[in-house]
Amino acid sequence: MPSDHGFLTSLGLEFAYFSGLPWLRGRRASGAGVVMRFERVRPARAARFQPLRSHEITPEFLDRTIRALKRWKFDIVSMDEACQRAVRLASPRRFACLTFDGGYKDLITSAYPVLSRHDVPFTVYIPTAFPDGVGEAWWLALEAVIARETRISLVMDRREQRFDIANTPEKYQLYDFLVDWMRSLAPPDLSAAIKDLCTRYAVGLSALSRDASMDWSDLAKLAADPLVTIGSATVNYPVLSNLKDADALREITMGRAVAQAAFHREVRHFAYPFGDRGSWRRQHAAMAEEAGFASAASAIPGVVESEGRTNLHALPRIAWDGRRRSLRAMRVIVSGVTFAPVKRARATGA
């Protein structure tokens, strides 16, 4: 839902653009480049309730983004190349690496035609339960329930709770509240909670999750393209910080093993599910390195530094807010001017 905070942030980015600040910042302070994080790419919708709008861009905006990055003299590179530039001496040109999380079906139907037309490399991170047809996109199911109902009830902490959601602001408020609650649950409890909610309100969790996700045939098409890097995002896409260490390591290693078996190639790159600061911890970076990944991408914003100053197993990414359509705002963000300087990375095992 649009907010005063979002408006002020956008206004600040526009002001920064016209102030010339991105061009006054030194080349070293701007980093070697940026890794950009996208999720869904699909045509704009007219629905008033779109709690995941910030996670979506249109194919037209993806096209504008790629054209702009080229115009701004960014080299659009693969994840392998991004990791190499992160440890080398600074290059005269900055890079941009395009990544897509979630394994959504619209990547193949809406994003891939745009990416192919521009002949640019990109990385897609796959939680392998979803192409297997057994993943649970609980955030989509929650959206479907709240969008359709004016009153819902569910069991929270062993107590029946009821919520009136007669208008759109109330729907947004409840969605945010329940997402925060569900993200705090251990995976078995989260699965039980969303299945109970879907049963009560006749939302087909399994069908919805399958329909929203690429299957293995879609992924095989992508894997056949030399410009596409297939990465892993665990098996079930859990909040790793809610798991015991042994379970988290199993999710990380099994996700890689399943993907490698499916594509008959090494899977070198990983993305933390959700990826924000609360969803993973330092020990998970060590696990990703132990599992054999060359990189592990977060959703923590920042630029990638050269000369080894960025920890490749805590790789920052710029998650673009799909509610923003200003390329001026994007140019400010990719300049690095909005991010604090990065301290030299230490080995994850230290």
Language-model features: where?
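C-terminal active-site subregion of NodB/CE4 polysaccharide deacetylases
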Residues: P2-T99, D106, A137, A141-V145, ...
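Extended, charge-rich helix/loop segments that form flexible
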Residues: R27-G33, R37, G135-D225
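Short, basic/glycine-rich phosphate-binding loops at helix/coil junctions
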Residues: P43-A46, L174, C198-Y201, T229-T234
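A short alpha/beta connector and helix-capping loop motif
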Residues: S110-T128
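A short acidic, amphipathic alpha-helical/loop segment
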Residues: S110-V114, D218, Q283-M287
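Active-site neighborhood of phospho(di)ester-bond hydrolases with catalytic His/Asp-centered motifs
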Residues: Y125, I230-S232, A297-A299
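Short beta-alpha junction loops
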Residues: T128-P131, P301-G302
